[in-house]
């Protein structure tokens, strides 16, 4: 089978390509220029070329920087301006990697596209679904929730049945040169955030604009350093007059540059709504597992789909729901779809 492999210049994607080559597939390597300095791109492309030379496969470099900026980067900035907590990776995957890059791969005659994501694909009743990775500590299925079933059918995740701790030893044994490659230490899960998301925002918007802190009764009880520096659940970086116990951000009013704070129990909710992006029309209302944050434990809840909105009801209090985050619905370890929390 002819498969396109997205190569980042790192160990995971290189070993993904190696494992597919060992299975006898015809491969085409693809490096995506999305968002980085030219210096970084040059290094990553050089690393990807070394992997391709070792494997005896061609490498193509696709420049999607303009598309990425308008569809992902600018949306990230806009979401924070609106007081939301966005998920750029969940936006990038369907639009860039499994959108534009997949389209290009198909034009090259490839049947599928592979990446180093920690996830799996499982076919159920002739329909392809994303399945959680074997290594639950590294599972990235959450970020793939917006993919359509027709797209999922064209995906390959060679690392999905492996443990992260085993990848590097396996890769260095198979491709010894990987241990000598130069690289940049990535400090964040978001590729375009070098230090902190605040530093990224500062390049485009006024972040340090002091505002007031209010309690749930609407009374002014303190000040903050600028609403974009806070997310739901944060408990530091603002003042509360006469506070004898911790206070948490429970709401953000972007238009007024105000924070609403309360006690930990005020973070609790028994329901939430999300704008549906990928649950299909045949979705049956019932009890499922949901995630409302990437590194959260799946929580049982009653989920229903009504007029394009996903409605979730919890039996137990659920904490820290932030607008703009992805709500992802699972049946056991099978991802059914999800949406954006409103």
From Swiss-Prot:
One of its GO terms (cellular component) is cytoplasm. Disulfide bonds join 92-191. It is found in: Cytoplasm. Keywords: ATP-binding, Cytoplasm, Disulfide bond, Nucleotide-binding, RNA-binding, Transferase, tRNA processing, tRNA-binding. It is an enzyme of class 2 (transferase). It catalyses: S-sulfanyl-L-cysteinyl-[protein] + uridine(34) in tRNA + AH2 + ATP = 2-thiouridine(34) in tRNA + L-cysteinyl-[protein] + A + AMP + diphosphate + H(+). It comes from the Bacteria. One of its GO terms (biological process) is tRNA wobble position uridine thiolation. The active site is at 92 (nucleophile), 191 (cysteine persulfide intermediate). Signal peptide: none annotated. Residues 138-140, 293-294 are annotated as: Interaction with tRNA. This is tRNA-specific 2-thiouridylase MnmA. It comes from Helicobacter pylori (strain J99 / ATCC 700824). The gene is mnmA.
């Amino acid at each position: 089978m002819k498969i396109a492999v997205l190569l980042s210049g790192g160990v995971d994607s290189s070993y993904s390509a190696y494992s597919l080559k060992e299975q006898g597939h015809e491969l085409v390597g693809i490096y995506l220029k999305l968002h980085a300095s030219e210096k970084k791109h040059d290094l990553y492309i050089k690393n990807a070329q070394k992997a391709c030379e070792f494997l005896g496969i061609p490498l193509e470099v696709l420049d999607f920087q303009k598309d990425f900026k308008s569809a992902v980067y600018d949306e990230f900035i806009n979401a924070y301006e609106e007081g939301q907590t966005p998920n750029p990776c969940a936006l990038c995957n369907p639009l860039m990697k499994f959108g534009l890059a997949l389209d290009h791969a198909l034009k090259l005659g490839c049947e599928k596209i592979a990446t180093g994501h920690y996830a799996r694909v499982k076919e159920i009743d002739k329909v392809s679904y994303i399945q959680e990775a074997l290594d639950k500590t590294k599972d990235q299925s959450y970020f793939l929730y917006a993919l359509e079933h027709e797209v999922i059918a064209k995906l390959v995740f060679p690392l999905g049945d492996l443990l992260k701790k085993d990848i590097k030893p396996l890769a260095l044994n198979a491709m010894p040169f990987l241990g000598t490659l130069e690289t940049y230490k990535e400090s964040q899960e978001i590729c375009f955030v070098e230090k902190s998301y605040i530093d990224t925002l500062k390049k485009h918007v006024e972040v340090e604009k002091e505002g007031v802190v209010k309690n749930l009764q609407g009374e002014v009880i303190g000040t903050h350093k600028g609403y974009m520096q806070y997310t739901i659940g944060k408990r530091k970086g603002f003042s509360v007059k006469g506070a004898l116990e911790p206070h948490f951000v429970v709401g953000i009013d972007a238009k007024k540059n105000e924070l609403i704070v309360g006690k930990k129990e005020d973070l609790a909710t028994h329901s939430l709504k999300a704008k549906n992006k990928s649950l299909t029309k045949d979705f049956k209302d019932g009890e499922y597992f949901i995630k409302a944050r990437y590194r959260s434990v799946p929580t049982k809840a009653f989920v229903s789909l009504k007029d394009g909105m996903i409605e979730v009801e919890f039996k137990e209090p659920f904490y820290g729901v932030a607008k703009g985050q992805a709500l992802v619905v699972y049946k056991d370890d099978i991802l059914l779809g999800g949406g954006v929390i409103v």
